[in-house]
């Protein structure tokens, strides 16, 4: 996919994180020292790892259908953008590149995929990315995810306690 975006500071900020994550995922060599924002990179890396761990079977099915990754990226980002979609796209493309890069030069392929993701995001959602303060927005996503997971855990625990008390009450009624 030829780049349709102007290659300004915003472009290179977006590309930096995406490209370094994909290279690290494929080589297993740390790339944190090469990124602009190491804290956001850690969040991105952990989130992508989680997405790949839980979705690798689905990713394999998509890859087996021989659908061009550009089409997949475009479809995922077609109607709206959020950090979850960006993370999923980056995770999928990293996984995809590791699976199919045997046919081409690794550095060449990582660059193509990274640029395609960056182009797809910025061609339609450049102002959103800037409004998110670039990669700083992913930190807020992490905090909301943590709050949601904590709330879910608390609700589950409260439900378990209430159910246990109800069972105890019913059992004590029959004794």
Curated annotation (Swiss-Prot):
Plays a role in the inhibition of host apoptosis by sequestering and inactivating multiple proapoptotic BCL-2 proteins, including BAK1 and BAX. Interacts with host BAX; this interaction inhibits BAX oligomerization and subsequent activation. Interacts with host BAK1. Coiled coil: none annotated. Keywords: Apoptosis, Host mitochondrion, Host-virus interaction, Inhibition of host apoptosis by viral BCL2-like protein, Modulation of host cell apoptosis by virus. It comes from the Viruses. This is Apoptosis regulator Bcl-2 homolog. The keyword Amino-acid biosynthesis does not apply. It is found in: Host mitochondrion. A motif (BH2) lies at residues 105-120. One of its GO terms (biological process) is symbiont-mediated suppression of host apoptosis. Pfam families: Bcl-2. InterPro entries: Bcl-2-like_sf, Bcl-2_BH1-3, Bcl2-like, Bcl2_BH1_motif_CS. The keyword Secreted does not apply. One of its GO terms (cellular component) is host cell mitochondrion. A motif (BH1) lies at residues 75-94. Belongs to the Bcl-2 family.
């Amino acid at each position: 996919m030829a780049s349709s975006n102007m290659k300004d500071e915003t472009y290179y900020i977006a590309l930096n994180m995406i490209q370094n994550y994909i290279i690290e995922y494929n080589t297993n060599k740390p790339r944190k020292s090469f990124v602009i924002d190491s804290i956001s990179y850690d969040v991105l890396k952990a989130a992508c790892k989680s997405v790949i761990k839980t979705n690798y079977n689905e990713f394999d099915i998509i890859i087996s259908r021989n659908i061009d990754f550009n089409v997949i990226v475009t479809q995922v980002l077609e109607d709206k953008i959020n950090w979850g979609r960006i993370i999923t796209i980056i995770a999928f493309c990293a996984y995809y590149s590791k699976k199919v890069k045997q046919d081409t030069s690794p550095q060449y392929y990582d660059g193509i995929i990274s640029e395609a993701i960056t182009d797809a995001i910025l061609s339609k959602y450049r102002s959103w990315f800037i409004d998110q303060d670039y990669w700083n927005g992913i930190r807020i996503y992490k905090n909301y995810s943590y709050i949601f997971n904590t709330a879910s855990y608390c609700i589950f625990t409260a439900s378990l306690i209430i159910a246990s008390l109800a069972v105890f009450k019913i059992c004590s009624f029959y004794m």
